[in-house]
C-alpha cells in the first residue's frame, strides 16, 4: 500500500467516523422530538398560508443523491445529470456523457424513482429523464375489510436541449436551455360505499395530465480563484420551472386542474479552493392562476468537500415555510461509476419529522474525445510559442491557425497571431529603415 493511498484511507475513515457520530446524535434527537420542536419554534414565523395550493406536488420532490444532499441549492452548480430539476441550461457545459439511476424513499411507503441521461455534442447539450413518484393506496370499507388497492402515482417525462453561446477560452459563454415536460397523475379506482363494488373509471376522473416547460440560464467565470484550473470557479444560474397547465376529469368533463408548482430560482456556486464549494439558491413560487396566492419564497444553501479525488461529503439546508429540510450525504467514485447516499430530515411536507433516504448511481461514459482534442490544441499552441521565441513568426502563426481550426474561439491563439503579425510588421519596418542607411 502506497503512502498516498494510506493517507486517503485515513482521511475517509475519520470522515466516516465523524459523519456516523453526528448522524447518530442527530437521529436520536429527532426521534425524541427535540430537534423537531426546536425547529418549529425557531421558524414558526415563516408559516405560509398559501402552501399546498398547487397540483402535481411531486414536481417539488428532488431526484435525490448529491444535489439533495447539498440542500437542493443546485441552480448554479448543476454539474452533473441531476441538472434536469434545477437548471436546464447545464447540459451544454457538462464534460462527460452521463446516465444515472436515483431511488429516493421515505422511511414509510412513498418513493421516487428516476432514470436520467445526458450527452453533449460540441456546444449543444441534450438529454432525457423519467421520474415516477408512487405510494401504495388501500381502501377499506365500513366493516374494515379491504375494498380496493393500487398505487397513487405521478410520472414525469422531461426532454432537454441547451446551447452554450459565444463559448471560448476566456469567456466561457452564455448557456441557455429548456426542458419540455409532461406529467400524468394516476389515481386507482375506488369502491362504492354502499355496495362495495369497484366504480369503473372512478380513478380516471381524478387523474390528471400536465404539460409544462423549464427555462434556464447559466454563466460561469472566475472570481477570487485560489487554485490553478481551466474550469471557472464561480457560477450564476437562473431558471423558471414548471410553467404550464394541467387538466383533470377524464372520462367525464375535462377541466383545468389546480395550478402547477411554478417557480423562479436564482443561485450561485463558489469554489473557493479546488476541494471546497459553497452553493446558495433563492426560489420564488408563482401561482399562475392567481399570483396573489403564490407561496412564499424559499432559500437553500449547501456545501461539498472533496476529501480525496474519489470520496466527497455534502451537507445542506432548505428553508421553505416554517419547516426546513436538513440533509447530508457522501459520494464514492469507482472507475466509471459514482455512488451517493443521502439522508434528509424532511419537514417541508409534513408536520411530523420525515426521515428520507436516497441512493444514486451514476455512470460516466467519457467525454467523447474532447480532452484529447484539447490536449492536441494545447500542444499546437505551445509549439507556436516555441517558434515565436525563436523568431520564426510565420511558423508560429501556422501552428496557432491549426489551433483555431480545432477551437475557433481559443483566445490565446488569436492573441498570439496578432502579436506575431505585429512582430513581422515591426521587423519589416526595422529592415526598411536599415536599407536607408
Placement of each model-derived feature along the sequence:
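Outer-membrane beta-barrel porins/channels
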Residues: 30-68, 111-112, 116, 120-405, ...
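Bacterial N-terminal signal peptides
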Residues: 15-24
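Bacterial N-terminal signal peptides that target proteins for export
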Residues: 2-16
Amino acid at each position: 500500500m502506497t503512502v498516498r493511498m494510506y493517507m486517503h484511507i485515513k482521511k475517509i475513515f475519520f470522515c466516516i467516523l465523524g459523519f456516523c457520530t453526528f448522524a447518530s446524535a442527530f437521529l436520536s434527537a429527532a426521534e425524541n422530538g427535540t430537534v423537531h420542536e426546536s425547529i418549529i419554534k425557531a421558524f414558526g414565523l415563516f408559516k405560509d398560508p398559501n402552501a399546498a395550493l398547487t397540483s402535481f406536488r411531486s414536481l417539488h420532490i428532488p431526484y435525490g443523491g448529491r444535489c439533495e444532499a447539498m440542500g437542493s441549492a443546485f441552480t448554479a452548480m448543476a454539474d452533473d445529470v441531476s441538472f434536469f430539476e434545477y437548471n436546464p441550461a447545464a447540459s451544454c457545459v457538462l464534460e462527460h456523457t452521463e446516465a444515472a439511476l436515483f431511488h429516493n424513499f421515505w422511511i414509510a411507503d412513498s418513493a421516487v424513482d428516476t432514470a436520467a441521461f445526458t450527452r453533449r455534442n460540441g456546444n449543444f447539450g441534450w438529454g432525457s429523464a423519467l421520474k415516477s413518484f408512487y405510494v401504495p393506496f388501500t381502501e377499506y370499507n365500513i366493516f374494515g375489510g379491504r375494498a380496493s388497492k393500487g398505487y397513487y402515482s405521478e410520472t414525469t417525462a422531461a426532454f432537454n436541449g441547451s446551447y452554450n453561446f459565444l463559448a471560448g477560452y476566456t469567456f466561457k459563454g452564455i448557456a441557455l436551455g429548456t426542458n419540455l415536460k409532461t406529467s400524468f397523475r394516476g389515481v386507482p379506482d375506488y369502491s362504492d360505499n354502499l355496495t362495495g363494488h369497484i366504480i369503473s373509471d372512478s380513478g380516471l376522473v381524478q387523474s390528471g395530465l400536465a404539460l409544462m416547460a423549464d427555462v434556464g440560464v447559466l454563466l460561469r467565470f472566475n472570481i477570487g480563484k485560489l487554485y490553478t484550473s481551466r474550469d471557472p470557479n464561480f457560477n450564476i444560474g437562473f431558471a423558471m420551472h414548471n410553467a404550464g397547465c394541467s387538466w383533470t376529469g377524464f372520462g367525464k368533463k375535462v377541466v383545468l386542474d389546480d395550478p402547477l408548482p411554478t417557480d423562479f430560482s436564482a443561485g450561485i456556486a463558489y469554489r473557493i479552493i479546488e476541494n471546497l464549494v459553497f452553493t446558495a439558491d433563492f426560489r420564488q413560487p408563482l401561482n399562475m392562476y392567481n399570483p396573489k396566492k403564490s407561496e412564499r419564497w424559499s432559500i437553500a444553501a449547501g456545501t461539498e468537500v472533496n476529501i480525496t479525488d474519489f470520496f466527497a461529503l455534502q451537507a445542506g439546508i432548505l428553508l421553505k415555510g416554517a419547516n426546513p429540510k436538513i440533509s447530508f450525504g457522501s459520494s464514492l467514485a469507482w472507475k466509471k461509476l459514482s455512488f451517493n447516499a443521502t439522508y434528509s430530515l424532511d419537514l417541508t411536507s409534513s408536520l411530523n419529522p420525515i426521515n428520507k433516504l436516497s441512493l444514486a448511481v451514476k455512470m460516466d461514459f467519457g467525454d467523447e474525445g474532447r480532452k484529447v482534442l484539447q490536449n492536441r490544441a494545447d500542444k499546437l499552441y505551445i509549439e507556436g510559442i516555441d517558434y515565436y521565441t525563436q523568431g520564426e513568426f510565420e511558423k508560429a502563426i501556422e501552428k496557432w491557425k491549426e489551433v483555431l481550426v480545432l477551437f475557433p474561439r481559443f483566445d490565446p491563439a488569436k492573441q498570439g497571431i496578432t502579436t506575431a503579425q505585429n512582430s513581422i510588421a515591426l521587423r519589416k519596418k526595422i529592415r526598411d529603415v536599415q536599407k536607408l542607411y
